[in-house]
Amino acid sequence: MRNIKLLIEYEGTNYHGWQVQPNGLTIQEVIEEKIAVMTGQRVRLTASGRTDAGVHALGQVANFQTSSQIPTEGFWRGLNSLLPPDIIIKSAAEMDPGFHAQFGVKRKTYCYWILNREPPSAIYRNYSWHFPLPLNQRAMQDAAGNLLGKKDFSSFRAAHPDTTDPVREVFKAEWSAKKPSFFCFTVEADGFLKHMVRNLVGTLVEVGKGKISGEGFKQIIKARDRRKAGVTAPPQGLFLVGVEY
């Protein structure tokens, strides 16, 4: 059997996330169906991680096993001819049998976009969180610096977590202005808890509003209690940028 790795870009607006679900169209389901059309085989795609409904990816990685002899270039070209325009295979590569898109991850990078101005955007409404009130970006950046290092991130996990270990190591947590009224929170870590990035953003926005102080943000991290943190930011501003192995 061959082990094929795919690098995938997708707009998550029209999907119920990555993982196959009984009551909603997902990205995994669509790609698996097109692989079956090409190879005549049903395969199981394993991704670096699951993205929620409405979340986007610039560099999702997934792998599958197949006995098909289609060249790797044929996989990405063929799949792109079959897939809808909001899902793109950027590349395909044949990997060693031991490669696993989920368990081999060393680092992941996410970016969360905020549109910080009073009027919303017709163009960017599916790619950013429109927040019309003023935000103190410097205060948000100072607070984000407290995320660096290996910590228990229980305060920022989902109400119904999908793992028992809440400890993750964050290598980068940075706010940056990209264009007028837009800024981005880039966070890089060895892994992320369910809803972790969106919960971090929601809490940091409270810092930017002046509702939570820098010291208060530190205490939220130490509390290890989801109830102490801010709201979950909406999904459409979140992008999985890349995965390192």
Regions found by a protein language model. Name each.
Residues 1-245:
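Structured-RNA-binding interfaces characteristic of tRNA pseudouridine synthases
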